[in-house]
């Protein structure tokens, strides 16, 4: 039976992310705003980091026009969960890149205004 031997430190580890020492600041220079948001539904709602906040579940109560073109200002790949009846203040950040939105709840389906 062959035995697998791993060197003390391979030069490449798949999926590894190497960063410089210190803090990493996210979304520097982008427009942000805070909104009070409440889950008016009877089930928990989880919203991911890159979901167009304007288009989240209709049970979420907040000023949708203020959220147009924005997403949660949280790390990529993470989410925020709202329990039924829960209210909290969230920070949103403007969507970047080409600002073209497709899918979600199909309220935009193209270039943001």
Swiss-Prot record:
Main location: cytoplasm
Pfam families per UniProt: Urease_beta
Keyword list, A-Z: Cytoplasm, Hydrolase
Catalysed reaction equations from the record: urea + 2 H2O + H(+) = hydrogencarbonate + 2 NH4(+)
EC number assigned by the record: 3.5.1.5
Places the protein is found: Cytoplasm
Hydrolase recorded as keyword: yes
Classification via NCBIfam families: PRK13203.1, urease_beta
Subunit and partners: Heterotrimer of UreA (gamma), UreB (beta) and UreC (alpha) subunits. Three heterotrimers associate to form the active enzyme.
Family to which this protein belongs: Belongs to the urease beta subunit family.
Designated name of the protein: Urease subunit beta
Annotated gene: ureB
